[in-house]
């Protein structure tokens, strides 16, 4: 594939949410074909390291089904993103990680994992009919997912767990109260955010990630609307270009004029939590964070949320695409059993 992961084509930016990156939500045990002996590693115990998110919550919810299917015992740990990343780097760098399966954020950790040689080559497993159900083939995954999952030599190092484009979650009730329509342009986005903001009622028009590092995709996603990517074709930074600076100014305005106090310390979890309370007009983040919106046990905005495409920028209409993977550690002594878990984790509902 000729396109560069860190300088994707417009088609790739606009295309990809989960083919599974298709599968997205893990769930009920699929009707796997008999060619795969799912009991082959019965009695094995796997340790699985996950990022806590709506997807990992769903995965853990259905773990008993995998254990019943395979006879494999799974010890799964799901920790918040920043802590999980620290833990994985420390343990993988030691050469003796405590886990067989690891969840990684492609857009943050792909190069680091490849440089460290931390993930096993699973290309052969995907092609092995005794390990992979015939209903799962490479073409089942979105192109963006495979671009993320393969290293520079085309070796498959993980299975795409998600490929998310970014959207705008918007509170239809708050918009209606102000007589506002969903914004179609960046200019309208700013105007709506400021019109919705009323600190006296603790209501704010916009929220997004503000904490260092996690805030980068917010800025770079806005850059796309100026027809600008962070890197050029030679891999050189374009973050000081006029377009990048203008996008940074837009981001700054949204966060300083329309966002709640303390937003500079927010990651996605804090931004999501704020939106769920019903006092935020718009939240800008990945489509994969949608499930809690309609969960009455977690959300005060059930039935009130709109899921909008990214508004059009001054020069382009685009959405950033980000992905997570799930792979087998290179040092695991249970690689094939661990691969069975990865396969199950990305299986269709």
Question: Model-derived features: where do they sit?
Answer:
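Extracytoplasmic/periplasmic substrate-binding proteins
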Residues: 111, 217-221, 249-343
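Hinge/lid segment of periplasmic solute-binding proteins
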Residues: 34-40, 106-165, 190, 302-306
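Extracytoplasmic/periplasmic solute-binding protein
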Residues: 146-161, 166, 187-237, 280
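Extracytoplasmic "Venus flytrap"/periplasmic binding protein-like
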Residues: 61-141, 173, 177-184, 274, ...
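N-terminal secretory signal peptides
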Residues: 1-9, 19-26
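Immediate post-signal peptide segment of exported/extracytoplasmic ligand-binding proteins
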Residues: 32-47, 68, 153-155, 176, ...
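Short, well-ordered beta-strand elements
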Residues: 42-53, 73-77, 100-101
């Amino acid at each position: 594939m000729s396109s560069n992961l860190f300088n994707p084509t417009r088609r790739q930016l606009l295309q990809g949410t989960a083919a599974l990156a298709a599968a997205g939500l893990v769930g009920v045990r699929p009707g796997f074909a008999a060619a795969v002996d799912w009991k082959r590693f019965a009695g094995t115990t796997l340790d699985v390291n996950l990022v806590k998110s709506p997807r990992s919550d769903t995965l853990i919810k259905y773990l008993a089904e995998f254990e019943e299917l395979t006879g494999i015992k799974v010890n799964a740990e799901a920790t918040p993103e920043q802590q999980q990343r620290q833990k994985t780097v420390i343990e993988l760098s030691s050469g003796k990680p405590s886990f067989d399966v690891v969840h990684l954020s492609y857009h943050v950790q792909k190069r680091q994992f490849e440089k460290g040689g931390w993930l096993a080559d699973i290309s052969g497993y995907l092609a092995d009919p005794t390990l992979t159900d015939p209903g799962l083939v490479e073409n089942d995954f979105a192109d963006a997912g495979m671009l993320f999952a393969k290293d520079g030599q085309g070796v498959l190092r993980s299975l795409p767990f998600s490929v998310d484009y970014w959207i705008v979650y918007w509170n239809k009730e708050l918009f209606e109260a102000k007589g506002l329509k969903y914004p179609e342009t960046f200019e309208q986005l700013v105007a709506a955010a400021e019109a919705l903001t009323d600190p006296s009622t603790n209501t704010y028009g916009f929220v997004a990630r503000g904490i260092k590092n996690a805030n980068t995709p917010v800025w770079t996603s806005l850059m796309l609307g100026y027809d600008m990517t962070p890197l050029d074709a030679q891999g050189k930074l374009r973050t000081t270009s006029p377009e990048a600076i203008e996008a940074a100014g837009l981001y700054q305005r949204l966060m300083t004029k329309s966002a709640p106090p303390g937003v500079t310390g927010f990651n996605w979890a804090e931004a999501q939590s704020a939106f769920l309370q019903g006092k935020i007009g718009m939240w800008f983040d990945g489509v994969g964070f949608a499930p809690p919106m309609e969960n009455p046990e977690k959300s005060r905005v059930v039935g009130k949320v709109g899921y909008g495409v990214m508004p059009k920028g001054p020069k382009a209409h685009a959405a950033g695409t980000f992905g997570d993977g799930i792979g087998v550690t290179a040092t695991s002594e249970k690689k094939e059993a661990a691969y069975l878990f990865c396969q199950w984790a990305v299986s269709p509902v």
